[in-house]
């Protein structure tokens, strides 16, 4: 199983990014793996406007943009997005 689809690895990533307390709520929202969390919002890391991320992820978790855990969620989302993109790239190269 790849890191993208591992629930255990997602939990570890939550811990590493300081948002382990949000893990149960992330799972309830259906975001139990990096692959699922990567597509929880239309936001693409690096774009100036992170409004979609704030609205679709942060606010849905009952947090506001100024919550200290928001930066951890951003890092987790970035990791999820880059892991999923790398996995897709790998699959395309082997097909």
Predicted regions located by residue number:
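Sterile Alpha Motif
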Residues: 1-29, 38-95
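Short amphipathic alpha-helical interaction elements and helix-loop-helix interfaces
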Residues: 20, 32, 43-47
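A short amphipathic alpha-helix within small helical-bundle interaction modules
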Residues: 26, 33-40
């Amino acid at each position: 199983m790849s890191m993208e689809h591992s629930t255990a690895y997602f939990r570890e990533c939550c811990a590493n990014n300081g948002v382990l307390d949000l893990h149960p709520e992330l799972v309830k929202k259906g975001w139990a793996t990096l692959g699922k969390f990567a597509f929880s919002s239309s936001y693409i890391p690096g774009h100036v406007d992170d409004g979609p991320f704030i609205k679709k992820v942060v606010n849905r978790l009952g947090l506001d943009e100024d919550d200290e855990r928001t930066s951890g969620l951003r890092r987790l989302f970035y990791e999820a997005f880059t892991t999923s993109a790398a996995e897709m790239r790998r699959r395309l190269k082997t097909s």
